Design a protein with these regions (language model features):
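PLP-dependent class I/II
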Residues: 8, 12, 17-28, 32, ...
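Conserved N-terminal alpha-helix of the aminotransferase class I/II PLP-enzyme fold
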Residues: 88-121
Length: 421
């Protein structure tokens, strides 16, 4: 067989395969076809594929603490296993864990909740999705400040709602103002999603900024705020502030939190909402049909995490703050990058738009996705373009990694972008 014949057969097989893939995709539900794949997971997968090929890639694309779950928490889980604590759990979570969450909210946040106002889920991601599905009807609007976590708009679309983006860019430290919020509200607005400390930017809303937003919300009936506080304990500027603290706002707020970031328990999959009882009942009804209650052993581990010493949380926070200072210093030394100092979480979100239109002779950078891919392919550092987060001028780096990895990654980035002219 001639080479041309082999090429023809190979091309025909590829065409048939693609046709089959697209035909199968067309049979998926319309609601599923509205969704986009996770850009953060896609970049992490690309990084893993390169590593499997023997390429030394530093992965700064994943939002996950690099620390291990503290030993005492693991021992609590082992004891639960030894005690045969392995049956189906109640849909809203075990009462003892919900009591521990109520105590946490009282002691740390000065917020008064009852056990019936707490619903424990399979991670904070499910908590967010439960809330959106329970409150947002077809065609209703959800205001999302941009930059935003990649899953927020997808969850709104899944519920049949309409994401309404409010641009809160680099020059305003990635925080939506009260005036912007007021201007975005329409008769169709049902919810605002607020993440503080923020993924992807690390920005933290002050008490005064939250009060101004709360005043706007309270002027509008039947308007709720989903307050994603999963990075609460990774805060470098002082006490965490919750929008639910202001008079009248507890009835309008759905707090989302969990153990994944604060206690390095991402794989344990425990999150929760604290909300008015009628909202909790609605989310409980939904969760009862989707997943039922969360893992019994994970709940025992989470309960112990909340009621035991919090020194492990502070130790990790201090380590993240040190790494924050290191990556900010090194990023500021790279010509072309503009840097805001993150006040919480473990992300840096520098502006990279000065490189757009530049080329190394082989690759031209047109946007933040190009820039992130360039860093991966040429510098072997995995990041995520800001396009995925609703900000085309920036890109996200996670500094939830060792000091050595941060230093080497920033060295590679500096050397790689220096080739762009």
């Amino acid at each position: 067989m001639r080479k041309s014949d082999v090429f023809l057969v190979d091309s025909q097989l590829k065409c048939l395969l693609l046709h089959k893939i697209f035909r199968n995709m067309a049979q998926l539900s319309n609601r599923l076809q509205r969704l986009a794949p996770s850009a953060t997971l896609a970049m992490s997968q690309k990084s893993s594929e390169m590593k499997a090929q023997g390429i030394d890639v530093i992965n700064m694309s994943v939002g996950e603490p690099d620390f291990n779950t503290p030993d005492a928490i693991k021992e609590a889980a082992k004891k639960a296993i030894d005690d045969n604590f392995s049956k189906y759990s109640p849909v809203p979570g075990y009462p003892d864990l919900r009591k521990a969450i109520v105590a946490k909210l009282k002691n740390e946040n000065q917020l008064d909740y009852t056990v019936n106002e707490i619903l424990v889920s399979n991670g904070a991601k499910q908590s967010v999705c439960n809330t959106v599905m329970a409150l947002v009807d077809e065609g209703e609007e959800v205001i999302i400040p941009a930059p935003y976590w990649v899953s927020y708009p997808q969850m709104v679309l899944l519920a049949g709602g309409k994401p309404v983006f409010v641009e809160a860019g680099f020059d305003q430290n990635f925080k939506m103002t009260a005036a912007q919020l007021e201007a975005a509200i329409t008769p169709k607005t049902r919810m605002i999603i607020l993440c503080s400390p923020s993924n992807p930017t690390g920005s933290v809303y002050s008490k005064e900024e939250l009060k101004a937003l709360a005043d706007v919300i309270l002027r509008h009936d039947d308007l709720f705020v989903l307050a994603d506080e999963i990075y609460e304990h990774i805060n470098y500027i002082g006490k965490h502030e919750s929008i639910a603290q202001f008079p009248g706002m507890k009835e309008r707020s759905i707090i989302v939190n969990g153990v994944s970031k604060a206690y390095a328990m991402t794989g344990w999959r425990i999150g929760y909402i604290a909300a008015p009882e009628w909202i909790v009942k609605g989310c409980n009804k939904l969760q009862g049909q989707y997943t039922s209650g969360p893992c019994s052993v994970s709940q025992k581990a989470a309960e112990f995490a909340y009621i035991s010493s919090q020194q492990c949380v502070e130790d990790m926070r201090q380590a993240f703050e040190r790494r924050r200072d290191l990556i900010v210093k090194l990023a500021k030394e790279i010509p072309g990058l503009e840097v805001n100092v993150p006040e919480g979480a473990f992300y840096l979100f520098p502006k990279c738009s000065s490189f757009y239109g530049k080329s190394d002779g082989e690759t031209t950078i047109n946007n933040s996705t190009d820039f992130a891919m360039y860093l991966l392919e040429k510098g072997h550092v995995a990041t995520v373009g800001g396009d995925a987060f609703g900000d085309p001028e920036c890109f996200r780096m996670s500094y939830a990694t060792s000091d050595e990895n941060i230093k080497e990654a920033m060295k590679r980035i500096a050397e790689t972008v220096a080739k762009l002219k």
